[in-house]
Amino acid sequence: MEYTPPPKPQLSSRANAFSIAALMSSGSSKDKEAAESTIKPLEQFVEKSSCAQPLSDLSGLEPHGDFSGSPSALCTEPLIPTTPIIPSEEMAKISCSLETKELWDKFHELGTEMIITKSGRRMFPTIRVSFSGVDPEAKYIVLMDIVPVDNKRYRYAYHRSSWLVAGKADPPLPARLYVHPDSPFTGEQLMKQMVSFEKVKLTNNELDQHGHIILNSMHKYQPRVHIIKKKDHTASLLNLKSEEFRTFIFPETVFTAVTAYQNQLITKLKIDSNPFAKGFRDSSRLTDIERESVESLIQKHSYARSPIRTYGGEDDLGDDSQATQSRGSAFTTSDNLSLSSWVSSSTSFPGFQHPQSLSALGTSTASIATPIPHPIQGSLPPYSRLGMPLTPSAIASSMQGTGPTFPSFHMPRYHHYFQQGPYAAIQGLRHSSAVMTPFV
């Protein structure tokens, strides 16, 4: 006799919705839809609009505003799409160019990354622009803001060395405009000078009270430069309504905000090209061609003493570099002699006796007894470099061969070895762990 299993009980529509098969099918379909919506190419967001409306701070500038630059960098989903606005005839003549474009291009090819911190971090490369076509008699306000490129969050895939979409963007942070501290400029100043935004700082602190630009980590951003024609009746720089303005965007300045560098090539390029990363630079890993290229970029991108530098400052830059090379530490003479070299060569002064512990410096007795002759100027010990100017009697006595005499006033605050007296200082230098720093 055959066994026939009992018929399976039919589930109601409500119970069927919670079955394993129903849950699995609905979950897979939702995941598929989420994945498709997440990995949409950025070009779809670019095609949705032909222009971008400034953020809330620039909402009053609609009647006279205009955006210049690549449409792909301008048009993003988080920004409000509007119709392109024709600028006034006077503002249409103004053009803006990005300085050190070659350096920006190098970073853009790799995917520029900018560090953001709680306290704020400066940008490198720096946004530096120059204007032409402005009215010499008019006054202009130059400002900068940074807007999101899209509404996506990214992650860096190390195995592919590329950025991938990780999901939707975090909630937008409060938008901020950075008004250049030297604004307003006259048109004549803008034609002669370069405007640098080197003091702009990026932060991820939503409660920042220092005026830094607030960004989200792992999001892509586009810096924008705005120039506004200031009218005489404008009471404040922040009263931008009814003002004529124009916006310039450079696609090569797009960057990803990060809390730590993701791409090692970006780290290397920043170390090699940033003049303030000198301590991390190892010139031996660069070829002659690379070193020459990097040095030329650094020279063009060297920081000026003020946020604005004239075009004729290249000659001054060369003078500054020569002056920097001529400056030495407290341990070198004008002839670039080290302290140990000066000690070994100072026996040319009659009456000078070496302590017995000098042999521990690695200088043989024979070399101490027969020093290499030096000219009189080079033989003078670097007391003036140590804060002890030579008196006329000291110089005269040293030239007459009777041994220099030095003033007996208190030595200024320099290295602690010299505060202990000459003999104790030489003994302190015997230890290899001694740190040679110019100041304490």
Curated annotation (Swiss-Prot):
- Record's SMART domains? TBOX
Q: Which Pfam families match?
A: T-box
Presence of keyword Nucleus = yes
Q: Name the gene.
A: TBX20
Gene Ontology CC: chromatin; cytoplasm; nucleus
GO terms classed as biological process: aortic valve morphogenesis; atrial septum morphogenesis; atrioventricular canal development; blood circulation; branching involved in blood vessel morphogenesis; cardiac chamber formation; cardiac muscle tissue morphogenesis; cardiac right ventricle morphogenesis
Residue ranges flagged as DNA-binding region: 103-282
Q: A single Gene Ontology molecular function, please?
A: DNA-binding transcription activator activity, RNA polymerase II-specific
Q: Where in the cell is it found?
A: Nucleus
**Keywords from the named record:** Developmental protein, DNA-binding, Nucleus, Transcription, Transcription regulation
The protein here is known as: T-box transcription factor TBX20
Fetch the InterPro entries from UniProt.
p53-like_TF_DNA-bd_sf, T-box_DNA-bd, T-box_sf, TF_T-box, TF_T-box_CS
UniProt superkingdom? Eukaryota
Q: What is its main location?
A: nucleus
Q: Note the Gene3D superfamilies from the entry.
A: Transcription factor, T-box
- The protein's organism comes out as Gallus gallus
> Where are the annotated segments for Disordered?
308-333
Composition bias of kind Polar residues appears in: 321-333
Q: What does this protein do?
A: Acts as a transcriptional regulator involved in heart developmental processes.
